[in-house]
């Protein structure tokens, strides 16, 4: 059966709004396009509304297969499956590959996270695979195509753009091919550290509250986060060895279509990694530097990779914070 988007009947919406008493309506904090991970590591595979997580699952359960009690060995196999998708990307360091995997984990469970950092793919030359990587990551959040937006030049423009983008509760917001650094626009900073923001809808006089449970991605050559954005963005560096990266021949030129067709398989890999880490007792690295505002994200998207022997996916965050020439401004 094919599903299509449609609005509910106006008369029912009007009756609900005029009724005033909305207590019978369950709270909805987000929409997920795949199964979710519970606090005990169990996977909720049923679609529809989940009163425990307050999420609405919009997916076909039979597309996803996760072991009932995943082990570390299951997690290692799942991680190998995801890393195989990243094999042809020219990551500058292994930590950048780890950050890309963390972005994929974030994409899968973004609706469950109160807040999550933005991910920015950076390279020195055109044709390095920046946009391709962001679109690959986006597939893990939604099987639909994602449209890209231009990065706003000032905070007023940024606020208007974010309100319009967040209004339909999208799984992904993407800023592609940035030509300027990622400025710390106040509205963007809030979206990255607050689960709900308020704003005035364009063309209307009313103010509304909007959920920020959306994965935010960006890419650009020789640009990145500055000042207060450095702690809100996880950079991923690509560094191809070719003089003209755009001429490179790929062994899997149709990778995006491959992943779309087998999305359930690869999303299940990400869920297996997180669930196995939780079932193992949620082991943490005591000496790991904390990333303020993103403790929940670190628990579910950072520590599992360290547990599996991968570099810290947030290492670049601390490097950029230290090296930022404008950090005192």
Predicted feature descriptions by range:
Residues 31-41, 56-64, 89-95, 118, ...:
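Short, mixed-charge, low-aromatic patches
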Residues 48-170:
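P-loop NTPase catalytic core of nucleic-acid-dependent motor ATPases
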Residues 6-10, 16-18, 27, 74-77, ...:
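N-terminal start-of-chain detector that recognizes signal peptides
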Residues 1, 11, 38, 54, ...:
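Context-gated lysine
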Residues 1-86:
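Conserved glycine-centered beta->alpha loop in an early N-terminal alpha/beta scaffold
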Residues 2-4, 9-13, 70, 83-89, ...:
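Generic detector of short, locally flexible boundary/turn motifs and exposed helical patches
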Residues 40, 107, 124, 219-220, ...:
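Structured loops at beta-to-helix junctions and adjacent beta-edge loops in soluble globular domains
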Residues 23, 97-103, 112-119, 140-192, ...:
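Feature primarily recognizes SF3-like P-loop helicase cores of small DNA viruses
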């Amino acid at each position: 059966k094919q599903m299509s988007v449609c609005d509910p009947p106006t008369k029912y919406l009007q009756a609900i709004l005029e009724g005033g008493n909305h207590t019978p309506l369950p709270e909805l904090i987000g929409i997920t396009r795949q199964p979710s991970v519970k606090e005990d590591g169990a996977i909720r595979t049923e679609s529809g509304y989940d009163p425990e997580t307050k999420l609405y699952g919009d997916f076909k359960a039979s597309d996803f297969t996760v072991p009932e009690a995943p082990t570390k060995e299951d997690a290692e196999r799942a991680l190998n499956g995801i890393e195989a998708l990243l094999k042809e990307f020219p990551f500058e360091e292994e930590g950048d590959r780890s950050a890309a995997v963390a972005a994929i984990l974030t994409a899968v469970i973004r609706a469950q996270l109160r807040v999550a950092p933005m991910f920015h793919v950076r390279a020195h030359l055109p044709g390095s695979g920046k946009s391709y990587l962001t679109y690959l990551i986006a597939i893990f959040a939604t099987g639909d195509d994602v449209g890209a937006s231009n990065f706003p030049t000032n905070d007023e423009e940024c606020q208007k753009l974010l309100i319009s983008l967040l209004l339909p509760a999208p799984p992904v917001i993407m800023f592609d091919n940035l030509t300027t650094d990622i400025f710390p626009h106040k509205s963007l900073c809030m979206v990255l550290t607050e689960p709900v923001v308020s704003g005035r809808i364009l063309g209307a006089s009313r103010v509304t509250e909007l959920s920020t449970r959306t994965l935010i991605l960006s890419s650009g050559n020789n640009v990145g986060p500055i000042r207060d954005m450095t702690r809100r963005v996880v950079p991923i560096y690509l560094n191809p060895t070719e003089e003209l990266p755009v001429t490179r021949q790929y062994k899997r030129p149709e990778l995006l279509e491959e992943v779309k067709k087998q999305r359930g398989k690869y999303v299940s890999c990400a869920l297996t990694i997180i669930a196995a880490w939780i079932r193992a007792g949620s082991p943490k690295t005591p000496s790991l530097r904390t990333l303020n505002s993103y403790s929940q994200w670190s628990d579910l998207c950072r520590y599992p990779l360290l547990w599996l022997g991968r570099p810290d996916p947030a290492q670049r965050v601390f490097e950029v914070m230290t090296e930022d020439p404008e950090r005192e401004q």
